[in-house]
């Protein structure tokens, strides 16, 4: 009996996984159903699902307790560990194994949070997103504020002057759709020069209010998305390309289309029929979406397009465009101030009022926008690192491999390969 067991083990150990006999397929199916089960306890958890409808119906009907879900996920992780120890895998299968392991570990982390377990901001971001954003002292932001202070005209506090300066660049509500449509069309045109997308891909845009976010891509499967834009607060002219590229081309819409096309439809990997928001996938999704606007619209080219097309459409004088972007370039360096507000607040080191004031002082938010951001932090917690830290990781990954602004073909190739791959944050360093 021992001899037979040993022979079977050696046969298993020498196996190289093929597409039709991949033991991870059953784990992937169970993973999808457990993500759907968590979604019954957390309305924000399942960002997209386009797998078998009966799995969704089953999750609703059963409403598994969180303890049962956690136990089932632990079992899947044990099975994955066994596969890793006994099965010889090629590079693609190794990446799939790592991806499933990290995604399942993030499910456990989210379940622990839902069960009331406390983690620090950095512990949570590592457990959910596979990354920890750098920490900056208040002095870092004070230095940046001093650099910005001399650039912004007017009198009074910098935050007040910054708000007043930007008022001249607000898109009038009655021109918003025309400006966004133009930005989306140009982002699509540029993306399709380098990315092969299915002919039926498309998305629709809706304008909404009362949300904690500025825009959201709801991927529906079948190569289609719904993009919602929050018009509750003023939208500035620079946000047209930001949102068109981030939510659409080559951002979230393209990312999801490529995953569905290359990994679900081609490879039949069912784990890509669901997208759990609080997972390592999100750092790549948000980071690539933020960096995507730079890939599609390099700085000088973006300014030219905006001055010639978007500014006139919005009825904004393009004469002030250079100054506007000079100010925004410096202000963008304050991005990590939002992380510090979230980290301090969620770790109990800042009161809500102090965190909100921090956003006003160091992110230069209006009181209304700071309040909206606080609601985002309370809803999505350490998710905030995925935008700036994620973008920095993606930028460094692409550019360190030759994908620089002076080599757009190479930049697009590396960027698109990343969108279609299984790489997570720890694999970008």
Q: Which residues are covered by each model-predicted region?
A:
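Hydrophobic h-region of N-terminal signal peptides that target proteins for export
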Residues: 9-18
């Amino acid at each position: 009996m021992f001899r037979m067991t040993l022979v079977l083990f050696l046969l298993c150990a020498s196996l190289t996984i093929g597409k039709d006999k991949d033991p991870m397929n059953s784990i992937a199916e169970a993973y999808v159903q457990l993500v759907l089960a968590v979604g019954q306890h957390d309305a924000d958890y399942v960002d997209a699902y386009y797998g078998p409808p009966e799995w969704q119906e089953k999750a609703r009907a059963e409403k598994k307790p969180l303890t049962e879900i956690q136990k089932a996920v632990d079992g899947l992780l044990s099975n994955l560990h066994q596969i890793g120890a006994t099965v010889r895998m090629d590079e693609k299968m190794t990446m799939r194994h790592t991806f499933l392991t990290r995604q399942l570990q993030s499910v456990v982390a989210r379940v622990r949070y839902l069960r009331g377990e406390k983690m620090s901001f950095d512990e949570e971001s590592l457990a959910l997103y596979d990354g920890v954003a750098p920490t900056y002292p208040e002095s870092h932001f004070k230095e940046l504020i001093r650099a910005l202070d001399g650039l912004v005209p007017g009198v009074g506090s910098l935050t007040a002057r910054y708000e007043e300066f930007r008022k001249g660049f607000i898109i009038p509500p009655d021109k918003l759709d025309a400006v966004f449509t133009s930005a989306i069309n140009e982002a699509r045109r540029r993306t399709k020069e380098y990315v092969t997308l299915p002919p039926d891909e498309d998305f629709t845009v809706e304008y909404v209010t009362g949300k904690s976010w500025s825009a959201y891509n709801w991927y529906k499967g079948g190569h289609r998305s719904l993009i919602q834009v929050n018009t509750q607060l003023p939208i500035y002219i620079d946000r047209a390309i930001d949102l068109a590229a981030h939510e659409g081309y080559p951002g979230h819409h393209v990312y999801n289309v490529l995953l569905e096309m290359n990994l679900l439809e081609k490879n039949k990997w069912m784990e890509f029929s669901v997208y759990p928001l609080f997972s390592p996938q999100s750092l790549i999704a948000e980071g690539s979406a933020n960096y995507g606007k730079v890939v599609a619209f390099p700085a000088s080219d973006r300014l030219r397009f905006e001055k010639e097309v978007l500014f006139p459409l919005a009825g904004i004088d393009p004469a002030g465009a250079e100054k506007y972007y000079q100010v925004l370039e410096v202000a963008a360096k304050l991005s990590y101030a939002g992380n510090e507000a979230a980290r301090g607040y969620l770790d109990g080191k800042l009161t809500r009022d102090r965190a909100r004031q921090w956003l006003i002082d160091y992110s230069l938010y209006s009181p209304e926008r700071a309040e909206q951001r606080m609601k985002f932090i309370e809803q999505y917690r350490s998710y905030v690192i995925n935008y700036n830290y994620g973008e920095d990781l993606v930028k460094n990954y692409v550019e360190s491999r030759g994908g620089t602004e002076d080599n757009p073909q190479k930049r697009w190739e590396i960027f698109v390969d990343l969108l279609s791959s299984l790489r997570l944050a720890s694999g970008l360093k």
